[in-house]
Each structure stands twice: as structure tokens, then as C-alpha cells.
């Protein structure tokens, strides 16, 4: 069971390598996998402490050459942009040592500007070598977002839309929603279409109880 193994900073699924750098998140989504599982693919993603940049780089260095990875993704049991500087430093390390042979992606709830006030988050990601962001929209309006994602920030939904709008000019942007009853998938798709970004629906992974 995942709960019996050491917490993983680096894990892999299919052709992608993932970096689990924090368990902090400003949202408390009722459907989040971490509410009823300790990890995925046999990896335990419940961190005992946040890894330093040096620790992330060390773990990454142990596995990065084991396969021709399609993407390296900042994604775990938390919001990566809670640790923007860690994301930037690790991305820069990857580009410095491995060039552009692998795509770098950040999976985010899109609240990077709220988490990092007074910073040009999107441009900093671009300058560090990040290619793509996958933004979890998970709603078709503010009321639904507040209901299912339960954000700690006021006006989180509006800020997610702002993040998408600013990111699309510099990065490859995909918007995702989870297939749950509260979300109007068509209306969410219309938002993505209006913003001019790609759209993907993710299946809801049910708890086992």
C-alpha cells in the first residue's frame, strides 16, 4: 500500500516524471484525491516535510536519465506555486543540465498571483524554462467554484481566469475540469473557448468507501 512506503518527491506515471514539492494548497476541493488516498501508482505523496531545492534536484538526478521522459511535471498533493521559487530554481536546473530535450509543465489551480503578490508569475515561469501550464478550472462560475473547490482566497475564481488570460500569451495553456455533477461541462468549455485555450475533462476518481 502507498501509505507504507517512504513519501516521494519524484514519481512517475507512464511517460511523465512528476515533482511533488508541497502538500499545501489554498483550495480544499471535495473531490481531491488526497482526501481519500495517500498517493498514486504505488507512490506515497503525503510529504513529512517540504523538500529543499537541493533535495528535489538530487531525487530528480537519480531518475531523469532512466528514460526518455515526455514531460517533467510539477504536480503532487499540493499547489506547486505555493513554492514559486522552488519551481523556478528546479526548472532552471533542468534547462541548464538537460536543455530543451524535455517539456516542462506546471499543473496549477491558477491562483499563482494570489499566492505570490507583486510578482510577474507567468513571465518568471517562462524565463525559467517552463513550457506549459495545466490550469484546474473545475467550475463554470464563481458560485460553483466556491462550492466544490472551497478556496481560502476571496475572488479566487476571478483570479484563476486572470491567470489563464495572462498565461496564454507566453505559455502553452490547457484548462481542465473534473467530471462531477456540479460542473456544467459545456459552460466550462465555453469559457476555455472564449479565452482561446485548450480544454480537457478529467474523470473523477471515486473513493473506495
Residue ranges and their predicted role:
Residues 84-88, 118-119, 185-189:
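Conserved strand-to-helix beginnings and helix N-cap segments that scaffold or border functional pockets
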Residues 30, 143, 186:
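Alpha-helical elements of the RecA-like P-loop NTPase motor core of helicases
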Residues 11-13, 64-68:
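Flexible, charged surface loops at secondary-structure boundaries
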Residues 37-51, 68-83, 98-121, 125-159, ...:
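Core AdoMet radical
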Amino acid at each position: 500500500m502507498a501509505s507504507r512506503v517512504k513519501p516521494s518527491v519524484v514519481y512517475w506515471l507512464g511517460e511523465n516524471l512528476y515533482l511533488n514539492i508541497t502538500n499545501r494548497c489554498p483550495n480544499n476541493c471535495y473531490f481531491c484525491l488526497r482526501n481519500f488516498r495517500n498517493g498514486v501508482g504505488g507512490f506515497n505523496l503525503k510529504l513529512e516535510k517540504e523538500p529543499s531545492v537541493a533535495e528535489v534536484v538530487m531525487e530528480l538526478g537519480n531518475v531523469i536519465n532512466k528514460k526518455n521522459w515526455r514531460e517533467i511535471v510539477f504536480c503532487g498533493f499540493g499547489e506547486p506555486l505555493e513554492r514559486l521559487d522552488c519551481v523556478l530554481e528546479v526548472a532552471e536546473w533542468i534547462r541548464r543540465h538537460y536543455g530543451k530535450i524535455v517539456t516542462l509543465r506546471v499543473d496549477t489551480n491558477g491562483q499563482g498571483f494570489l499566492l505570490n503578490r507583486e510578482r510577474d508569475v507567468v513571465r518568471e515561469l517562462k524565463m525559467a524554462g517552463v513550457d506549459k501550464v495545466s490550469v484546474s478550472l473545475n467550475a463554470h462560475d464563481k458560485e460553483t467554484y466556491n462550492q466544490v473547490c472551497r478556496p481560502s482566497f476571496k475572488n479566487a475564481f476571478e483570479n484563476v481566469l486572470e491567470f489563464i488570460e495572462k498565461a496564454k500569451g507566453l505559455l502553452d495553456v490547457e484548462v481542465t475540469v473534473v467530471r462531477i455533477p456540479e460542473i456544467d461541462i459545456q459552460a466550462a468549455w465555453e469559457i476555455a473557448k472564449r479565452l482561446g485555450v485548450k480544454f480537457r475533462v478529467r474523470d473523477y476518481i471515486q473513493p473506495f468507501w
